[in-house]
């Protein structure tokens, strides 16, 4: 977040914004850039999709116990390098798999559920009844909830096996997963680089095929940016599409439970299970839930121009200053590919776009300062003794909370203080209204909007940890979507130079509220025709 005076200037100086400006998109080439090829041996480690797992169980080729053993074996081989998980529930996963096999034998596969035998990683800010839930913070070290988050419960009811809790930046506040109170997760494409954040553990776990799919949360890009960095599919649903019950609150008006998969099909399958109204969350929507997977068209049934008649706007402000040249090239080549599939692609200007970042950090920090006041060392988590209650509170929070969390609490408290509320918080809310209006107008003209998911590919561990402004600038592509409450899908679209096999780049697709089905359909067509999902990180060939 910019310093207070700089943020104030940005927020006070905005003027009435015109409707989005459009100009014809010009591609940099006629063909999408060729992804960097990983070694052929990686094919032997190709991940099992949800569909292939189900087919294996149905045919009797493999049991749930055998599938679980295979994933746990890969997890044990790769975890020392990747460090995706804070807690691995291997014994519990093996027991659940054996119980699934017994149920399949007696009741049949359909009775067990559509996710039978599918191993899921769960971001550690989602509550799980049978394993620790820390939020990535030492202040909750050892805390074990008495209940499952609604999204977790729905996965279990569908037959999924939770293999463990994935690492994250503390309470979701960060973009690299370096801010975890427990360990630093690495990127499976290059273990000297960050996986993104805050859901870096969930993204790296799917990328390294330590689990089939995973859950994350997205407050300002925490699913989409790590999906781009790790070369997997990441979905941020519409605000209210998935229940937040059991999610440790960071910024309640922005937080969304999302998911990762190695393909759009797997991601769509997970969304169908976790989406829907929940009486335990007053902000959850009663909007109808589709069978998102059934709406996807396989490659052999696609028309020659499957996106014919579709209008796509590429956000002009996301292709300028501060965005790496290789990322811009990959996104423009992806847009060119969308044109080849029959769509009309034009650049569109969203004049409020640059105001979103400072507004986001004011609003998110303000909400965090309230939400995190519950962690006081009394009811659960780390406690530091003191001579009186104030010393106990202060000592517990000072020792249990990390630097980034404390900094955002201070910023939020400052923005909400009596003398500065109108100058910061109220003005940020006004900017949020402008952002919503800007997206609404653009999406009345276009079926979807596209942009990079991040201004760069994965960077070196430690490169930005001491430069908060550079770190926050990495959220430029994603925070506006949270401010507007819109759904967004990230699909791998190419590679830039770096590491031994290149570094992935993700294309962000943004839609109108509750248009997840359309995003997944377009993303599936794009993915199949590029087939990026078949490329896996070098780590798997080496493990």
Curated annotation (Swiss-Prot):
Quote the cellular component terms of the Gene Ontology held in the record.
Answer: chloroplast stroma; glutamyl-tRNA(Gln) amidotransferase complex; mitochondrion
Catalytic reaction(s) noted: L-glutamyl-tRNA(Gln) + L-glutamine + ATP + H2O = L-glutaminyl-tRNA(Gln) + L-glutamate + ADP + phosphate + H(+)
Tell me more from the record: This protein may be expected to contain an N-terminal transit peptide but none has been predicted.
Task: Tell me the first and last residues of the signal peptide.
Answer: none
Provide the alphabetized UniProt keywords: ATP-binding, Chloroplast, Ligase, Mitochondrion, Nucleotide-binding, Plastid, Protein biosynthesis
Q: Report which gene this protein is encoded by.
A: GATA
EC number, as in UniProt: 6.3.5.7
Q: Which residues form the active site?
A: 123 (charge relay system), 198 (charge relay system), 222 (acyl-ester intermediate)
Q: Does the keyword Repressor apply?
A: no
Annotated GO biological processes are:
glutaminyl-tRNAGln biosynthesis via transamidation; mitochondrial translation
Can you say where in the cell this protein is located? Mitochondrion; Plastid, Chloroplast stroma
One term of GO molecular function: hydrolase activity, acting on carbon-nitrogen (but not peptide) bonds, in linear amides
Q: To which protein family does this belong?
A: Belongs to the amidase family. GatA subfamily.
Q: How does it assemble?
A: Subunit of the heterotrimeric GatCAB amidotransferase (AdT) complex, composed of A, B and C subunits.
By what name is this protein known?
Answer: Glutamyl-tRNA(Gln) amidotransferase subunit A, chloroplastic/mitochondrial
Residue spans crossing the bilayer: none
The protein's predominant localisation is mitochondrion
Q: Which EC class heads this enzyme's classification?
A: ligase
InterPro entries associated with the record? Amidase, Amidase_CS, Amidase_dom, AS_sf, GatA
